[in-house]
Amino acid sequence: MFGLKATYFYLIAIQISLIKFFKKIYFTTNYYNKSLKSKIPKQIIFSPNPFLLTLISPYQKNSFKINEINVSEFWLENKNRNISDQHSFLWLNLIDRKIDRKNIQKIIYLWMLKYSSFKKGVWETSTLSSRLISWILNIDIIIDNGTFDFKNNFFQNIVTQCNHLKKNIKYEKDLIKKVETIVALSMSGIMFKEYEENFRLGIKELDKFINSYFDEDGFPLSRNPNDLIHFTKYMLLLSKSIKDAQQHVPDFLEDIIKKNLICIKLIKTPNDQIPFFNGGYENKLNSLDNYLNELKVNKKDKKNSVGGIFLAKSKQQVLFFDIGGPPSKSYSKNYQSGPLSFEYFLDGAKIITNCGFGKNISQKAELISRLTASQSTLTINDTSVTKFERNKVINRVFGNSIKSSFKTTQLNIQDDKNLTGCSVVHNGYEKNFNCTYKREIYLDHVSNKLLGKDYIFKKKDGIPIRYVFRFHLNPGLTAVKTMGGNSALIQISKNKSLIFTVENENIEIEKSIFLGGKKILENTCITISGNLVNKDKSFNWEIKKKI
């Protein structure tokens, strides 16, 4: 049975789905495709830096070799090929600019013969935007020594695809695609004098996007670290291109890029990744290294939390702790239900982890990775703190958004010469189980160890609950339960180990799975579990080096 809010989202989803259905039919008509044609630019007004494509391209060196491909067969339909991979042209950053020029021109010529009019998949918003950006950044080599007809046709194809984006940008609800569209349109506007209005439109839309989607620190309201990385890369690409064109970079764009980079620098882990909270998965940051190294973070910019992630560091230890509530439904399609979960590093090695977002593996892996049991935190009666939307119509439009919420309160931060950490409470289990959960977690600078204290506050209602605290170990680490039953030996390497200990409780060692990469990995999980009726309970635990 739908509640009022669910009914609203359902009706909106129905409306958007119907509009998309009829628009896709309309897009395939000759009338629509003719409407996309407009004035062909005479020339480009600046040569962009093609190496900026490395900011957004997922391709690594030697992963795509043009000279080993039969160019004439490049666009033959092949079920084993990913349409987005081919048609995005993000692989252009791998070409040998001296050897591959002729082949690139032929590949694009054949593409224009086959795909100049709208085709589902090939003209999907993200793929199309990436293609435009890739073409524009490599435009010098693409048109070099090309015939007049080839240049004209190529320019016309850029304009046609830009016009398609312009006609539909106001209907785009996916914020990732929105930013990609904005950057593609803006770059076309600084490339062609005849289409300067594209630049003005892009900057106007970008200003609105930034004002509505980032908090005061520059962190996305989705609380997703991967969103932060994605948006930063695209906005950096645009900013650098504007500078290369010797045009003024809007102050708001420079301001948000600086804030974004500060956030990334603060949450960057010792293994050069992002913490696995709220949609985070393995994401190489090497394309941002130069920008991060150049960035100087002033004292006023140093914060103990960004995006609802608490940060604590000592000489050898690093802690990331999820102290925030869930994002709003509109921004929650990648949210993982792991309030008060944490990740812990010692001597540069990751010890405690969340399972990561399974987006790059499968839909099932993505669903599993969103559950509370996949995070290093408390579950009660094997349920997730946040319930997720199951209605297929709503999910098709808004993604797998949340349908229930909770609050985090009573944040208390401690930072002195002995301890750095904090305590916080969430009420996610209050409605169903009459419980609230509090976690205190600190880096002990004196003893160089991690201290934790968990509390379950249970109302006296006579209803029993089953609690489980999970501590997921990073893949590659193993754990063995000790004879006492209340501790585990965590093996890091042949000559290095840690000891996990909990007072007056038994632990168990279980198998788990890690979903933050491109394939499922097995890992180990330390658990503390039991039953509770009509009383509160606290749990004291620590992780320290084995001497």
Residue ranges of predicted features:
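Carbohydrate-active enzyme catalytic cores, enriched for enzymes
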Residues: D215, F219-T353, F357
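CBM-like, beta-strand-rich accessory domains located in the C-terminal region of large
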Residues: F2, T7-Y10, S129, N360-I547
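Short polybasic amphipathic segments
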Residues: I56-F64, F310, F342-Y344, D454, ...
